[in-house]
Design a protein with these regions (language model features):
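An N-terminal assembly and electron-transfer interface module characteristic of large anaerobic redox
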Residues: 1-169
C-alpha cells in the first residue's frame, strides 16, 4: 500500500525534537533498493555538502582526497571493502573517503575538497554528477577492488552473465 507522508514536516519535527540534522527521502516501497539509495545519496550531498576552501592551516585529514560514492553493504558484500579501498589509495599516497561505509557527515560536508570521486555502484552516479556540477569535481565509474574479485581466466570470445552489481562486474 502507498500512503501519503509529509516528509518535510516529519524532518522538521524530528530535527526540532532531537536537535540533530535529519534527512528524509521520499520512497514508496514499490521500487528496488537502489532507487531509494540513489535518492538518499543525492539528498545527502544536496543538503550537507558545502563549498570549502583549502587553506594552509588545514590538517592532513581535511586536505583533498578521493571520494568513494556507493559503498554500502547492500552493493558491496565484503564488509572489509572500504578499508581495502582506503589502503589501495593510501598506497598511492592518497586518502580515500568512503561515503556510506565508515566515513561520517563531516566528510560529506567536506565533499568539495575531493580531487575526484569514484562511483562504485549505479545508485551513486546521480550524486557524483551533482557534485561535478556544484563543485566541478570530476568522477569516474570504477571499482578499485575488481581485480581481486575476478579470477584470472581468458575471457576472450566468452559470454558473461552479470548478476547484481554492474560496476563491480
Amino acid at each position: 500500500a502507498v500512503i501519503g507522508t509529509d516528509y518535510r514536516a516529519l524532518e522538521r519535527m524530528l530535527s526540532k525534537k532531537t536537535d540533530l540534522s535529519v534527512l528524509t527521502v521520499n520512497t514508496d516501497g514499490m521500487e528496488l533498493y537502489d532507487k531509494g539509495e540513489e535518492k538518499a545519496y543525492l539528498a545527502l550531498f544536496e543538503k550537507f555538502s558545502d563549498k570549502n576552501e583549502e587553506s594552509e592551516d588545514m590538517n592532513d585529514k581535511d586536505r583533498p582526497h578521493i571520494g568513494i560514492i556507493g559503498m554500502t553493504p547492500q552493493d558491496v558484500s565484503d564488509l572489509k571493502a572500504a578499508n581495502k579501498i582506503r589502503k589501495v589509495y593510501a598506497d598511492q599516497g592518497m586518502r580515500a573517503i568512503c561515503y556510506g561505509m565508515g566515513d561520517g557527515l563531516d566528510e560529506v560536508r567536506n565533499a568539495s575538497l575531493a580531487a575526484k570521486n569514484v562511483v562504485v555502484s549505479p545508485a551513486a552516479l546521480k550524486a557524483a554528477q551533482y557534485l561535478q556540477k556544484k563543485f566541478g569535481t570530476p568522477y569516474e565509474i570504477a571499482y578499485p577492488l575488481a581485480s581481486e574479485l575476478v579470477p584470472e581466466v581468458n575471457y576472450q570470445g566468452k559470454k558473461i552473465l552479470i548478476v547484481q552489481q554492474q560496476v563491480i562486474a
